[in-house]
Amino acid sequence: MVMCTLCKREEAVFMRRYSGEKLCGKCFSKSIENKVRGTISKYEMLQPKDKIMVAVSGGKDSVTLLHILTKIEKAYPGTALSAVTVDEGIKGYRDEALKVAKKNCQKLGVKHVVTSFKEMYGYKLDEIVNMIREKEL
């Protein structure tokens, strides 16, 4: 069993090829959070009282970012974090992801705005594709 090179207590589940680090789940998660914190700090991306909106598709990457930003937001008094999900209007494509996004926002107490291509452009993406196909025929 290969042990985590950081905590030396847990079994490693991930290896960083560029550094040779072998990380357990907790240390891996903490290292990602620290990278996000470092980037935000280095580029002065957040100031107290900023309004932050994160795009949340419902996939693992955006949901992870939402969780990390929820933790980081606490270090910036007066900031307001909210999330937006865009429903493109592709039949059967976004349904489950919308549920995941909504569930995570509710769990974290983050305001969640859902918008759609239909609201923004007057058409669902499926309708736009059909119109383009009809013109090409």
Tell what function each PLM region has.
Residues 4-137:
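ATP-dependent adenylation/nucleotidyltransferase module used to activate substrates
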Residues 1:
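Nucleotide/phosphate-binding catalytic cleft detector across ATP-hydrolyzing
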